[in-house]
Amino acid sequence: MERIMVALDGSDHSEKALHLASDIAAKSGAELVLLHVMSDKPLTDAERHMAEVEYLDELASSLDATGIDSGGDPQTRAQRMLQHYADVAHRFRELIGQRLMSQSRARARGRGVRSVQIVLEDGDPAGTILRLAKGLHVDMLFLGSRGLGDAKGLLMGSVSYKVAHLAECICVSVK
């Protein structure tokens, strides 16, 4: 076994997946790839609250909140405001991803993993996980059986369900 990937979203189940994947990587000497996929969907209420409570200073310093011109055509102003909102949402998710990856790398190294690669990607979680697992020639893939998704995920099919059924490598869904 040369390469193990763990998909992380900050949920308790993905944290357990990290521990298990780290233990196996440490014992086998495999490289551990930590993956976090950033959604391009609008922020959830929970994410907006987290942004206000935990990340407000970092967001304020990285974005120019006064960058939206209040003059001109209302439609153009509205488009600029929507783009600004999308930029703020993306930057917030980037900050979450960077913090999650930094903490996860430290945990993996603390469990004896020597080689850790971090990957932050935008896009559809299931599709991105599958594409990268194949492209990076991953031997084993770990992910939480239940992530931070909403109730819609129960109806549409969860990321772990899709990945488990379509992955070309060993796939471990951790509960």
Please report, for each region that a protein language model flagged, where it lies by residue.
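Absolute protein N-terminus
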Residues: 1-2, 175
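Short, conserved glycine- and acidic-residue-centered signature motifs
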Residues: 14, 93, 97, 156-160
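A structural preference for short, hydrophobic beta-strand core positions in alpha/beta folds
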Residues: 34, 117-120, 173
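Small/aliphatic-rich secondary-structure junction motif
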Residues: 2-83, 111
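Gly/Ser-rich helix-loop-strand patches that form or flank binding pockets
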Residues: 23, 126-175
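A structural micro-motif
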Residues: 30, 114-116, 169
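Structural beta-alpha unit
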Residues: 74-141
